[in-house]
Amino acid sequence: MLKVFKNIFIIFARHTLQFMKKTEKYQLLYEQIKALLGKEKDEIANMANVAAIIHKTFNFWWTGFYRVIDNELVLGPFQGPVACTRIAYGKGVCGTSWKEAQTIVVKDVHEFPGHIACSSASQSEIVVPIFKENQVVAVLDIDSEKLATFDETDKEWLEKIVGLF
């Protein structure tokens, strides 16, 4: 019986989530991630869970992390199709976000100079740097198969979320 109620709750939660405003989703997401990260100290485990929860909440095309290792971005935990494994400093949206140490919102990836097309389905993208001791140590990269998916609301909340690391 408990399993039935749990399944009903999951269905209800998914149904409710699709009718929530973006800001409401992020508020809920932030609190869930904050609680989740408070219990675990392993960064890879945390990145894996954060990628999964963001990906599931918003149904993005690709959600994941690239970590700075030996002066390049190396693929970390992600949700979605196969991705580029390594990205050079200053290259593509991820490398540029790392170089400029700031969030980049791209309404149309085909208009971004030097865009690295890991997937032809990607149409818009947001990349948010993660800082430790004022240095970029990783980036959160999210792609959508729709144009102009990301805006200031995404930027504000995703920066707040990566600030939890």
Language-model segments: which ranges?
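Short hydrophobic/aromatic beta-strand element in the GNAT-like acyltransferase core
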Residues: W62, V127, V139
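Cationic, amphipathic, low-complexity segments that mediate targeting or membrane/lipid association
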Residues: M1-V4
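Regulatory sensory and allosteric helical modules in signal-transduction proteins
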Residues: V68, E72-C118
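Juxtadomain coupling helices with adjacent low-complexity linkers
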Residues: L29-Y30, K34-L36, A138, S144-F165
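Short, positively charged and aromatic/hydrophobic N-terminal segments
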Residues: K6, I10-I11, T16
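Intrinsically disordered, low-complexity terminal regulatory regions
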Residues: L17-P77, K160
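A short, aliphatic-rich beta-strand micro-motif
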Residues: S124-F131
